[in-house]
């Protein structure tokens, strides 16, 4: 026996009410909680999938985890023990090199080296980071984890009938959010514009920032006119107006749109060389980082460096993780000391979520 053990359990998350996106309506989502134990210490991570968006084949997650568990049981974890001895209690101002070391360990374990299982790789990265902190779920210690700083976040408005969306908008405004993100593309575009017009009648751009996310719902043919129409509401940006893998069409939109465009789905599944090529071809105003969909913090951080080199803005978004994954993503986000609202969830979506020490007050996410 190596003294190293990987275990997991599937625990699908149940939505309090159906969650509508342009890809359909979700009532539950597949989730696995993983645990990595070595020499009496344990670390936890989460495999979080979004059906129709995540690359990881849902039906193969259990098999991949079983294969990895067998490999790890048979392996003498010399490298991991050395890593934990050298990095345990490390100064996380050097978090990039810590993540690089973890990436090397995951590569040696053959975890999604072909990019087919980014969410699974993220879960193992999380578990290794948690091991470093002694299993305290303090993936990245900072003034955020100490409760000294908070992260500005947007309030998310789910798709649905106009009355349901209006109800959500009023609730988020009452909670003190200074930035709202509306998912659009599921109902009639005129009705969505009427909703935006109604918000703007009451709140100026200085009082309330509005972002919209089309999840690729527009076509290259109708997108220019729709972007022009949306721009009259003085929006901050629109996420993924057309579906991914249409680089020339998206590049034309980014060059000519009166509204800033943020790429989201466009980042999923691209290898190292493709990432630079895509950013150079499309030249978006922003990119959005979702670690579960990109293979974890190491790869998401590489995207950020590429964006910064090109003068492209970014923000970080959770992707329907449980409170475990959300906490890790929030801690990583805090390292970048964001001043603009991030797209971090608040753990309120599910009937069976894990306990959390995070809370939102006045549009700021922090340790409660």
From Swiss-Prot:
Enzyme Commission code(s) on record: 4.2.1.113
Annotated InterPro entries: Enolase-like_C_sf, Enolase-like_N, Enolase_C-like, Mandel_Rmase/mucon_lact_enz_CS, Mandelate_racemase_C
Pfam family, one: MR_MLE_C
Keywords of the record: Lyase, Magnesium, Menaquinone biosynthesis, Metal-binding
Chemical reaction(s) catalysed: (1R,6R)-6-hydroxy-2-succinyl-cyclohexa-2,4-diene-1-carboxylate = 2-succinylbenzoate + H2O
Pathway named in the protein's UniProt entry: Quinol/quinone metabolism; 1,4-dihydroxy-2-naphthoate biosynthesis; 1,4-dihydroxy-2-naphthoate from chorismate: step 4/7; Cofactor biosynthesis; phylloquinone biosynthesis
Ligand binding (Mg(2+)): 213, 239, 264
Root EC class: lyase
One record GO biological process: menaquinone biosynthetic process
Residue numbers annotated as active site: 183 (proton donor), 290 (proton acceptor)
PROSITE patterns on file: MR_MLE_2 (PS00909)
Protein origin, superkingdom: Bacteria
MF-aspect GO terms: lyase activity; metal ion binding
Needed cofactors: a divalent metal cation
Entry function: Converts 2-succinyl-6-hydroxy-2,4-cyclohexadiene-1-carboxylate (SHCHC) to 2-succinylbenzoate (OSB). Does not show N-succinylamino acid racemase (NSAR) activity with N-succinyl-L-phenylglycine as substrate.
Record note on quaternary structure: Monomer.
Family, per entry: Belongs to the mandelate racemase/muconate lactonizing enzyme family. MenC type 1 subfamily.
Protein name stated in the entry: o-succinylbenzoate synthase
Organism of this sequence: Desulfotalea psychrophila (strain LSv54 / DSM 12343)
């Amino acid at each position: 026996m190596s003294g190293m053990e990987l275990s997991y359990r599937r625990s699908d998350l149940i939505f309090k009410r159906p969650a509508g996106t342009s890809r359909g309506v979700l009532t539950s989502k597949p989730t696995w909680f993983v645990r990595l134990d070595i020499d009496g210490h344990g670390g936890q991570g989460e495999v979080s999938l979004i059906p129709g968006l995540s690359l990881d084949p849902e039906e193969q997650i259990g098999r991949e985890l079983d294969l990895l568990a067998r490999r790890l049981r048979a392996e003498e974890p010399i490298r991991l023990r050395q890593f934990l001895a050298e990095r345990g209690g490390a100064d996380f101002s050097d978090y990039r090199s810590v993540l690089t070391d973890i990436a090397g360990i995951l590569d040696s374990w053959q975890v999604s080296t072909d990019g087919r299982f980014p969410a699974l790789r993220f879960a193992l990265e999380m578990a290794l980071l948690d091991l470093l902190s002694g299993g305290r779920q303090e993936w990245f210690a900072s003034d955020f984890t100490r409760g000294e700083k908070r992260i500005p976040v947007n309030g998310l408005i789910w798709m649905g009938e106009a009355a349901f969306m209006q109800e959500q908008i009023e609730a988020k405004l009452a909670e003190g959010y200074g930035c709202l993100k509306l998912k659009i593309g599921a109902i009639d575009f005129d009705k969505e514009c009427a909703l935006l017009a109604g918000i703007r009648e009451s709140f100026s751009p200085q009082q309330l920032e509005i972002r919209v996310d089309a999840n690729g719902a527009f076509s290259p043919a109708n997108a220019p006119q729709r972007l022009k129409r949306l721009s009259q509401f003085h929006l901050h940006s629109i996420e993924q107006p057309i579906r991914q893998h249409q680089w020339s069409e998206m590049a034309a939109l980014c060059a000519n749109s009166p509204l800033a465009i943020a790429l989201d789905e466009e980042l999923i599944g691209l290898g190292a060389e493709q990432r630079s090529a895509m950013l150079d071809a499309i030249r978006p105003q922003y990119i959005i980082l979702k670690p579960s969909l990109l293979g974890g913090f190491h790869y998401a951080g590489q995207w950020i460096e590429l964006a910064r080199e090109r003068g492209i803005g970014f923000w970080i978004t959770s992707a329907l993780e449980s409170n475990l994954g959300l906490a890790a993503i929030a801690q990583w986000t805090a390292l970048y000391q964001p001043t603009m609202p991030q797209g971090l969830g608040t753990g309120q979506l599910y009937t069976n979520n894990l306990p959390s020490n995070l809370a939102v007050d006045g549009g700021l996410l922090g340790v409660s």
